[in-house]
């Protein structure tokens, strides 16, 4: 099966949508707080079993997959025809969407990793010497915000792919026209010589 723009677009969309869904589920499954168990020397936090940390890491993994496929799809030589990167970046629209896709990917990764790592640390370091410790969990809303940014990121990669495809077609059409212009005068001169 040949790699096409449509296949790459579907792959980017699939990974981006999966990252979004996992991030939203992680937000919904996150417990509001742990239960403090008071001991003689401190507080031990008991947290209910939930898949928040695993879902957060999976969401980040699929965000990375969407980004890698999105980035590679922009510069892939479809039908064996390569286009210089400089040609793509001459398009202002492509440059804008490329940079916005990179920025939104970084922001999405930050907003997904921050609560995931925080929640992971809360689960691992659950003994505290402070008797007033309330056993908090990661901030509410970060998983959801990161999930929506992950979806936005994949959409920006798709738009950049569409703009890159248009720039690629324009470049290849211009290249084809230049070859025809070069060949036609040489044929006319050859015809004059034969007569």
What is the meaning of each model-derived region?
Residues 116-133, 138, 151, 155-177:
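Cytosolic juxtamembrane helix at the C-terminal end of the final transmembrane segment
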Residues 17, 27, 31-38, 106, ...:
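Extracellular/luminal ectodomains of secreted and membrane glycoproteins with large N-terminal domains
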């Amino acid at each position: 099966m040949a790699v096409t723009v449509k296949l790459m677009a579907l792959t980017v969309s699939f990974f981006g949508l999966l990252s979004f869904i996992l991030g939203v589920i992680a937000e919904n499954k996150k417990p509001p707080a742990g239960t403090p168990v008071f001991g003689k020397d401190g507080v031990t936090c008991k947290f209910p079993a939930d898949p928040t940390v695993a879902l957060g890491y999976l969401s980040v993994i699929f965000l990375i997959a969407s980004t890698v496929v999105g980035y590679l799809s922009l510069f892939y030589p479809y039908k064996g025809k390569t286009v210089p990167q400089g040609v793509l970046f001459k398009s202002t629209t492509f440059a804008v969407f490329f940079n916005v896709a990179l920025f939104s990917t970084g922001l999405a990764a930050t907003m997904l990793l921050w609560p995931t790592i925080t929640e992971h640390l809360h689960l691992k370091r659950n003994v505290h010497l402070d008797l007033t410790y309330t056993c908090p969990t990661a901030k509410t809303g970060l998983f959801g915000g990161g999930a929506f940014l992950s979806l936005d990121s994949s959409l920006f990669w798709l738009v950049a792919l569409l703009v890159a495809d248009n720039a690629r077609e324009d470049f290849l059409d211009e290249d084809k026209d230049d070859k025809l212009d070069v060949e036609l005068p040489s044929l006319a001169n050859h015809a004059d010589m034969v007569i």
